Amino acid sequence: ADNQHPTVYQKVASQMHLSSSLSQDVHARYGGIQRPALSQRRFPYGNYSNAGLQTCQATQDLSLIAANASPVFVQAPQEKGLAAFATDFLMGGVSAAVSKTAAAPIERVKLLIQNQDEMIKAGRLSEPYKGIGDCFSRTIKDEGFAALWRGNTANVIRYFPTQALNFAFKDYFKRLFNFKKDRDGYWKWFAGNLASGGGAGASSLLFVYSLDYARTRLANDAKAAKKGGGGRQFDGLVDVYRKTLKSDGVAGLYRGFNISCVGIIVYRGLYFGMYDSLKPVLLTGKMEDSFFASFALGWLITNGAGLASYPIDTVRRRMMMTSGEAVKYKSSFDAFNQILKNEGPKSLFKGAGANVLRAVAGAGVLAGYDKLQVIVFGKKYGSGGG
């Protein structure tokens, strides 16, 4: 059974949100892609290889964008039978729910810090957060400990449609952009990766984007605010949909969608560009066979690409926050310019530190859950990305 299922390292590598984790989430998270050569050689782990590099590739989940483009480790029904597929699909859902729920407090803090300026402008936050610790303590003090999981339900729910959509789209885009690096050359392969990742990611994103919108609005619905007399703006997931549709229509649920699609391509371009530039330089000789060297390289590349593309995640979420408000950004470009002009470049990276912590927490819990599956069921089941 172990040869048919990835180890925890590969499963963590495919996660995210991490993911989105712009994920958020990512490398091989985009359906139908050719993985870099290093991740396919030298380290035998069943049908997967080089666990070190793949593990750290998972640690940056830039939320829905990366997560929606993740490949599906539970195989399609025609490949292994409906019963086995259903079992893996459901167990993957439990795995995703466990890892997302464990990391939810850090994820909410990340979103609060990232979007605090929009909340202040809307009168829904009294004063800025001084950092991760201050955000944690104020949230617990004002809303209670359980409030750290606000918005997590929507985040868990979207796993299932995301996985189903990945089944529908990944094979199509794989056939459409099936370039090989050794056969077609680097640039065709590189462009094919961007196109297939962007196409598959955007297609899935179209169907589940509103859930990430709802999750973002719920997570940023701080209780202690001047507006509303200290009450909440939304009563729950359904209320987010109801109020947004009433005030902004369907467009309100998709605010920031275009820049989210761009983010998929930007992250992939940064990831593969950094990988092909650094791998031949750093992983040479004995280092090529080193698990820890490949782990370090994967960590460096994933977090480097994630940090460089983080402003896109900030812009899209800041745009989400304007649905239902009187003043909105005219476009993602307008949002980017206004944030830079009024708040400075640092504002585009607010919450990035918490995002890295969230990825580590999610990966650690997933590792423990994988061990539990082996103890209880005697095998490892497919893990859910997204």
Swiss-Prot record:
It is found in: Mitochondrion inner membrane. The chain crosses the membrane at residues 85-112, 153-177, 186-206, 257-278, 292-312, 352-372. The matrix-open state (m-state) is inhibited by the membrane-permeable bongkrekic acid (BKA). The cytoplasmic-open state (c-state) is inhibited by the membrane-impermeable toxic inhibitor carboxyatractyloside (CATR). Residues 1-76 form a transit peptide. InterPro entries: ADT_euk_type (IPR002113), Mit_carrier (IPR002067), Mitochondrial_sb/sol_carrier (IPR018108), Mt_carrier_dom_sf (IPR023395). It is a multi-pass membrane protein. It comes from the Eukaryota. A motif (Nucleotide carrier signature motif) lies at residues 316-321. Keywords: Antiport, Membrane, Mitochondrion, Mitochondrion inner membrane, Repeat, Transit peptide, Transmembrane, Transmembrane helix, Transport. Solcar repeats lie at residues 83-176, 188-281, 289-375. Disulfide bonds: none annotated. The keyword Metal-binding does not apply. ADP binds at residues 158, 170, 316. GO terms for cellular component: mitochondrial inner membrane. One of its GO terms (molecular function) is ATP:ADP antiporter activity. It catalyses: ADP(in) + ATP(out) = ADP(out) + ATP(in). Pfam families: Mito_carr (PF00153). Belongs to the mitochondrial carrier (TC 2.A.29) family. The transmembrane helices are not perpendicular to the plane of the membrane, but cross the membrane at an angle. At least 2 of the odd-numbered transmembrane helices exhibit a sharp kink, due to the presence of a conserved proline residue. Monomer. This is ADP,ATP carrier protein, mitochondrial. It comes from Solanum tuberosum (Potato).
